[in-house]
Amino acid sequence: MWIGVISLFPEMFRAITDYGVTGRAVKNGLLNVQYWSPRDFTYDRHRTVDDRPYGGGPGMLMMVQPLRDAIHAAKAAAGEGARVIYLSPQGRKLDQQGVRQLATNQKMILVCGRYEGIDERVIKTEIDEEWSIGDYVLSGGELPAMTLIDSVARFIPGVLGHQASAEEDSFADGLLDCPHFTRPEILEGMEVPAVLLSGNHAEIRRWRLKQSLGRTWLRRPELLKSLALTDEQTRLLAEFQREYQSEQQEY
């Protein structure tokens, strides 16, 4: 996968390209991230990249000419088929379904805003999609872009040690993940569930699915409303609810 990044602070992306799963993906040639800074497309000695908004008001906007030139340079490098994405609070909220959709793109250009944003005409002429990572304000689009890159990269074949890891992540099937345990078997008096030590893979799968359904019901019940549960899932959720309510009555 090829990703171009338009940012005033490309050095921030070393957190993605130099470390962890995404760092290995870059090292192994599975993920290629390139950068264009609008500052490199300025013509004044101060390398100005911000400008005052028409109509007044607080704050500045990114200057149009350097930003457009940076986007055009990235498009030229990408060639045909690259989607240009602006990280924006006004965009579609990123979720696992959106990540899967974005992961089908082989080429993307991510535009990271700064200041109060970018000129609306640039959005209309240069941007294909707008995406948001949540209903809150950040200082720029770099962190959302890194979030998008990290989440999408997990679906590139070969990036994860076991491709099932991406398929079993929280939200991969619309549910939260089940609890996980490692050694020791007993930690401060709390034991690993016996079923996980049993070696019975069918029972382990059933337990994990039930816990995933139950955790979603407890913590994110709105997610269940959008799912068409199978007969097995319906039974397991009801079983979890009965067990949970019984435990609550004991207290």
UniProtKB/Swiss-Prot annotation:
Q: Which GO terms describe its cellular component?
A: cytosol
Q: What does this protein do?
A: Specifically methylates guanosine-37 in various tRNAs.
The enzyme's first-digit EC class, named in words, is: transferase
For this UniProt record, the keywords arranged alphabetically read as follows: Cytoplasm, Methyltransferase, S-adenosyl-L-methionine, Transferase, tRNA processing
Query: Which residues take part in binding S-adenosyl-L-methionine?
Result: G113, I133, G134, D135, Y136, V137, L138
- Name of the molecule in the record: tRNA (guanine-N(1)-)-methyltransferase
Q: How does it assemble?
A: Homodimer.
* Reactions performed catalytically: guanosine(37) in tRNA + S-adenosyl-L-methionine = N(1)-methylguanosine(37) in tRNA + S-adenosyl-L-homocysteine + H(+)
Which family does the record claim for this protein?
Belongs to the RNA methyltransferase TrmD family.
Name the source's superkingdom.
Answer: Bacteria
List where in the cell it is found. Answer: Cytoplasm
Give the species this sequence originates from. Pectobacterium carotovorum subsp. carotovorum (strain PC1)
Concerning Pfam families, the annotation shows:
tRNA_m1G_MT (PF01746)
Q: Which GO terms describe its biological process?
A: tRNA N1-guanine methylation
**EC number(s) reported in the record:** 2.1.1.228
Predominant location category: cytoplasm
One GO molecular-function annotation for this sequence? tRNA (guanine(37)-N1)-methyltransferase activity
| InterPro entries on file | Alpha/beta_knot_MTases, tRNA_m1G_MeTrfase_C_sf, tRNA_m1G_MeTrfase_TrmD, tRNA_m1G_MTases_N, tRNA_MeTrfase_TRMD/TRM10
